[in-house]
Amino acid sequence: MQLGLDFNLVEDLVAGVDEVGRGPLCGPVVTAAVILDPSRPILGLNDSKKLSEARREALFEEIREKALAWCVARAEVEEIDRLNILHATMLAMQRAVEGLSVTPRLALIDGNRCPRLAVPSAPVVKGDSQVPAIAAASILAKVSRDREMVELDRLYPGYGMAGHKGYPTAVHLEALSRLGPTPIHRRSFAPVRELLDASVE
């Protein structure tokens, strides 16, 4: 039994915001914003990295059903390469908060900095393992991105994206050097950029 965060910590109209996919060499960075409903408890909420895939999938459906409002947003590979990963992540977080159907009175952002928002915000370091709404956001973002990487694995076979989700594993790096980058690889990330530079020389 995986114990979750104390749902009594949920406050009215507070959005939790988190991202997944800053480290991978390919694919989008995906963010989510969630306003939980204090009257509709969700048991077992925790940092998505601490949950099994099956548990994340079950909570994904429950969060979308019970939350007062939620939004999954993203920044594309082209935006990551143009802006850099930090600015692209902030942009995707803005999109998630702006996409909520209910305006939060406060947005709590996982990490140590906040995007520019039209509502008050505060960063919470390791927020996904402390704040239920951020944990819920981490689950929506991770499940959404993982599902997309499985689809991209079908479009670009041979790289093992369904397994490593784009992270720079030995399998991914070997496939990258053997097959070359796809259109969804981040050209601004060193392993991809170095490969492209070498092919030009």
From Swiss-Prot:
Manganese or magnesium. Binds 1 divalent metal ion per monomer in the absence of substrate. May bind a second metal ion after substrate binding. Its cofactor is Mn(2+); Mg(2+). Signal peptide: none annotated. GO terms for biological process: DNA replication, removal of RNA primer; mismatch repair. CDD domains: RNase_HII_bacteria_HII_like (cd07182). Belongs to the RNase HII family. This is Ribonuclease HII. The lineage of its organism: Bacteria, Pseudomonadati, Pseudomonadota, Gammaproteobacteria, Pseudomonadales.
